[in-house]
Structure formats: structure tokens, C-alpha cells
Amino acid sequence: MRVRFAIATLALALTTGCATGLNSVQKAELDHYEARGMAVQEKNPGLGAGLGLLPGGGSFYGREYGFGVVNLLLWPLSIFWDPVSGYEASRSINYQATRTHIERQRKKALDELDAKLAGNEIDLKEYTLQRRQVEERYTAY
């Protein structure tokens, strides 16, 4: 009975212990923004991975508190998956922060452009040209 419980607990921990992470499109988008210097780094992925060696550290750092408690209880076994969890969670947090920042910047630029058009500071042709430039600046592809 104890062996079954231990195997079930280990299987549960191994299947749920890691953060889901980003899909390939999100990774490409974040890499694009990082290359252009537009990414926001709220969490350091290297630090998240390093803290994963401590009991539950990677999960707690990545704001996965439930998994952090489980990994704390399963330490030292959790050092096999918690560094990956901390790294992936940090990247996910950075992706969300970057998306929010980029969208705010884009909206601000478009609002300023709309105000110029409404105030007759620019004509429709100039508005269209500048709007296209704003869209290109804040689009990942």
C-alpha cells in the first residue's frame, strides 16, 4: 500500500511539477522583442533555475505557490524538475509583462496619432503612413 502511494505521489509530482512554459510562437515572439531591446525582464530565468535547486525555490520564484509547497515536501527529488519549472515560469512571466508593456506602448502611440489627426495637425495620408510605422514597430513579426 505504501509503495503504491509513493509511486502515485511521485507520478503526480513528475507530471505536474514543471511549469507549462511558452509555446513555440510565444518563445519566438519573446526572442524577437528581446533582440530588439523591447522585452521586460520581471524575473531572471537563470535565477529561477538556480532557486529550483532549493526546496521549492523555483516554483515559489515563478509564482507557482501550490507547486512550491509540493516541491518543498518532495525535496530533494524536486531538484530534478524544479529548476526547469523556475526557468519556464520566469520566461512566462517575462512574456506576459512584455506583451502588456508592448500593448501599452502601442496604444499610447496610436492615441497620440489619433489626437494629431483629430486636431488637424496631420492629414489622412500622413496619419496612414505613421499608423503603419507604429504597427510595424510594435508587431513581433
Sequence positions of predicted segments:
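Transmembrane helix recognition focused on a "late"/terminal membrane span
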Residues: 18-48, 71-141
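Membrane interfacial helix-start motif at the N-side
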Residues: 34-43, 54-67
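Hydrophobic alpha-helical segments, especially transmembrane helices
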Residues: 3-5, 60, 132
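Alpha-helical transmembrane segments of integral membrane proteins
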Residues: 4-8, 43, 47-51, 66-70
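Sec-dependent bacterial lipoprotein signal peptides
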Residues: 1-20
